[in-house]
A protein has these predicted regions:
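Conserved SAM-binding strand-loop segment of SAM-dependent methyltransferases
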Residues: 228-238
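Conserved proline-anchored active-site loop of SAM-dependent methyltransferases
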Residues: 176, 184-194, 250-267
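Conserved helix-to-beta-strand junction in the class I
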Residues: 175, 201, 287, 293-297
């Protein structure tokens, strides 16, 4: 991992002498692959009958998981396909390789030859059957560094019966504790996991999601439709909801802002600098400022990130306009989950 001294010092503030354990842990995937069952549309038992490799979670009744296996041995072939970081991190978990993620192809034979898939920094992450660059599917992965069910291929996922969501992320909706007739706003709603989870827990609340691009809003609406939920979604820069929409007296707000994603794993490699972290910090504070304007007195904010720096977590929520009811951290090397931070804030009267 290529982190400058500022980032390392911040991580050391969190992890102390265990910083190396943390840095090693983010190179590996979570040992469990979680999905959330849409219990408004199906039952846990019915899904488990169709997905026998999954098991019930110990804490959340709507959560099931499959065990991730590996590391596995990757065969090294003369023919190779080199992919970008994001594609490599998916392929190492067993996902197929599609054209947008391919950076270079070195293949001497015909299509349907076996190839090794490499990250762009030279790490072999998978092997499979090469279909050529003429089609969207470039490599059908047959063996990967780690293996888990290919969720994207499941009809249950395509039809809205299940949703891929990490366990740490599932805590957010539960800690929000949505109640009937409350107005709840998700300020950064895409890709929709927390938004739809809130509705699943409390369909009688008024739930509104915002995101700032038309494409993301369209995808959110597609997700909501296939999950058969009644959620409002609008395109907006949610830092200006009060000014642009005159929204006020909201009961609860979720903020899951853009962040450095240091807690996300597995990572093939990563690079972050002081400027990256401080820019995120300033951006994140703007969402909290907007939440203050639209919340009622004693209204609730659940602030969460998939990163672990103090600058993007504790130093964001330390705001004199709010009282911090609690803060929770999940550590990859301790809890075997994504590195994650959640805080519950109350707007002062």
């Amino acid at each position: 991992m290529d982190y400058d001294e500022f980032v390392i010092e911040d991580l050391r503030e969190v992890y102390g002498s265990y910083i190396n354990e943390f840095l090693e842990s983010i190179k590996k995937p979570n040992p469990r692959l979680y999905v959330r069952v849409n219990t408004l549309k199906t039952t846990i038992d019915d899904v488990l009958r169709q997905l026998p490799q999954f098991k019930r979670d110990e804490d959340f009744e709507e959560a099931i998981y499959a065990e991730v296996k590996g590391p596995n041995k990757i065969n090294i072939y003369d023919d190779k396909v080199i992919v970008d970081k994001k594609t490599a991190e998916s392929a190492m978990m067993g996902a197929n390789v599609y054209k947008p993620g391919v950076k270079k192809v070195i293949v001497s034979g015909n299509r349907k030859s076996y190839v090794t898939v490499y990250s762009d920094n030279g790490i072999p992450v998978a092997e499979g059957i090469y279909y050529g660059m003429h089609s969207d599917l470039v490599v059908e992965v047959t063996n990967s560094l780690y293996s888990s069910p290919k969720l994207a291929d499941l009809e249950l996922l395509k039809r809205g019966y299940i949703y891929a969501q990490g366990k740490a992320s599932m805590y957010v909706a539960h800690l929000l504790d949505p109640q009937p007739n409350e107005t709840i706003i998700d300020m950064t709603a895409y890709p929709g996991g927390k938004l739809t989870h809130i509705y699943q827990l409390q369909p009688k609340a008024r739930i509104i999601g915002f995101d700032h691009t038309s494409k993301k809003v369209e995808k959110l609406r597609e997700l909501i439709s296939k999950m058969q939920m009644r959620i409002e979604v609008y395109k907006a820069d949610s830092r200006y909801l009060y000014e642009d929409f005159n929204i006020k007296n909201v009961d609860k707000v979720i903020i899951d802002p853009p962040c450095s994603a240091l807690g996300v794993r597995p990572k093939i490699y990563d690079k972050k600098t002081k400027d990256d972290i401080l820019n995120f910090h300033e951006y994140q504070k703007q969402f909290l400022n907007a939440a203050y304007k639209i919340l009622k007195e004693r209204g609730v904010v659940i602030y969460s990130t998939c990163t672990v720096t103090t600058w993007e977590n504790e130093k964001v929520v330390e705001d004199p306009r709010f009282s911090v009811e609690y803060e929770i951290r999940f550590h990859p090397h301790v809890h075997n989950m994504t590195g994650f931070f959640i805080a519950k804030l109350i707007k002062k009267g």
